[in-house]
Amino acid sequence: MNLIGLTAALTAFFSIWFGHVAVRKIEFISPTIWIPTTIFGAVGISVEFLSLAMVNRPSSVVFGILGITLLFDAFEFSRQQNRIREGHAPANPKNPRHDKILVQHASATTLDLLKRDPVGESVDPTRAAKLLTEH
């Protein structure tokens, strides 16, 4: 029985899920983004080299997917910061880096647009903000 496909699918699902959550949480609290970016990049490259050195194919697949996911997450830290500037992700007013973003970019917000109840229709930005602050 060949389990490489299942192994690859599960590894991709869980590593992407972990990366998404980790980037949001780490970027939210980190006073600089270069440190987590460097760590994720270095670990990603190391895991990729480990994947290349493995003889066991399923393990090589797992490490290859984990490595490339970590490398992409390193790139995502700067993209997440851009989402905060544009108001697409919440800023953390307790984070000095985010505090500067809130001052410099009128579109930045502390409202988490993912923490809302859907109303089943399109709403304008004013009503969206009202819906977010009501709950």
Residue ranges and their predicted role:
Residues 1-17, 25:
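Alpha-helical transmembrane segments and their cytosolic membrane-interface
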Residues 19-20, 40-50:
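Hydrophobic, membrane-inserted alpha-helices
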Residues 96-135:
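C-terminal membrane-adjacent module
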Residues 9, 13, 42-46, 63-70:
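Hydrophobic alpha-helical transmembrane segments of multipass integral membrane proteins
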Residues 54-93:
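Alpha-helical transmembrane-segment detector that highlights a single hydrophobic TM helix
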Residues 1-4, 53-57:
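Helix-coil boundary and interhelical linker segments in multi-pass alpha-helical membrane proteins
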Residues 18-28, 74:
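C-terminal ends of transmembrane helices
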Residues 29-44:
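Loop-to-helix transition at the N-terminal end of transmembrane alpha-helices
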